[in-house]
Swiss-Prot record:
Pfam hit, one: NQRA_SLBB
PANTHER family with a match to the protein in the record: NA(+)-TRANSLOCATING NADH-QUINONE REDUCTASE SUBUNIT A (PTHR37839:SF1)
Listed EC numbers: 7.2.1.1
Protein name (Swiss-Prot/TrEMBL): Na(+)-translocating NADH-quinone reductase subunit A
Function: NQR complex catalyzes the reduction of ubiquinone-1 to ubiquinol by two successive reactions, coupled with the transport of Na(+) ions from the cytoplasm to the periplasm. NqrA to NqrE are probably involved in the second step, the conversion of ubisemiquinone to ubiquinol.
Catalyzed reactions per annotation: a ubiquinone + n Na(+)(in) + NADH + H(+) = a ubiquinol + n Na(+)(out) + NAD(+)
UniProt-listed NCBIfam families: nqrA (TIGR01936), PRK05352.1-1 (NF003758)
Coiled-coil features, chain-numbered ranges: none
Lineage, highest ranks first: Bacteria, Pseudomonadati, Chlamydiota, Chlamydiia, Chlamydiales
Amino acid sequence: MKIIVSRGLDLSLKGAPKESGFCGKVDPAFVSVDLRPFAPLPLGVKVSPGDQITAGSPLAEYKSFPGVFITSSVDGEVIEIRRGSKRALLDIVIKKKPGVSQTKFSYDLHALSQKELLEVFKKEGLFTLFKQRPFNIPALPTQSPRDVFINLADNRPFTPSVEKHLSLFSSKEDGYYIFVVGVQAIAKLFGLKPHIVSTDRLSLPTQDLISVAHLHTIAGPYPSGSPSTHIHHIARIRNDRDIVFTISFQEVLSIGHLFLKGFFLGQQVVALAGSALPPSQRKYLITAKGASFKDLLPQEIFSSNDVSLISGDPLTGRLCNKEENPCLGMRDHTITILPNPKTREMFSFLRLGWNKLTVTRTYLSGFFKRKRVFMDMNTNLHGEKRPIIDSEIYEKVSAIAVPVAPLIKALETQNFEEACRLGLLEVSPEDFALPTFIDPSKTEMFAIVKEALIRYAKENVLTPL
């Protein structure tokens, strides 16, 4: 199936890394295992500071679903278990042993039964790689998905491409073969053919995949690479019984690597990007999963008060300035550095804005079609917070047929019945990144949707055994 997305916004941001290769490998002294994505679920920590661990060691367990573990991908020593507000678990910091873990595992994918395969996924931390719709929560082992979607079309700003992720391996062919094994494992685990969504320019091993997966291509501006867009156009979620699991290309590589090579894939490709980074520092690196920012960034950038440190892309990433020793998030492959101006732009309301980005034609640039211009973005809001406006401008950048303003209003009043009627079950917070970005009222739609999905999920599916 070929999907063409017309709505969205092609964000051309300054600060992208150079496309010409990599700038080496970095073996960080410290890494962390990010537990923030599991906030909707109560976790039981299985380690203490000072414990020696190896790749595959269980670090935390789902309390409500015993036997599902979050595991380490490196060898080392547990240094700290960090907690936030109300003692919520944030991450587990590990002092990493130099080099790649040599802890070996022996699993024969073809010999394992479906039940045995599920136990392997739960024990080795592979099940925690899946996310579940509705609600955009960690996948639950008690749920049987209607479909599984594998995303090879991620086009968030500065996010490394599929080709960049394949640089982890000796050849592109080797990387694709590992991916095929991962897809085979997913197909066997759930007894279905997953949906693989990629871009036209990718040369996938079609002959190896066609028997175990449905292949689709998608084209269009961001958010054409969002899983919500893929699900909406291929197999839409109609009610809360339509369970769909989603997983990224990189996470499928982790699954395939364990079954084919017998080792945890402890490395990842990271993009260092953002207009606050000097051009010479904008690059791709191969480093350990969850690497410390301090090991990846120049000291003058890491310690600067004039920049914003973001784990992830500039639209959906986590702001890390207030963290003592920030590390990459669980699903993040980008570190974004943006300017953090301390003063307002002089007479900004009187400027013509020829080089300003606008969707609402606030500036002169909105009235002319020009060649691609790269925008130099910073963290200024360019105005104060105002009441939300009921406008169709949000739908211009939304790739799914969900009325943005009415849905946000329903969520703010906790009218979940109305919110579900408007499409809450289909969405994730990422779907509101662009509406938040262009919103004249400065409403934090991303945060509103995220909190509402967690709250509604706790009332409906996240109940203890």
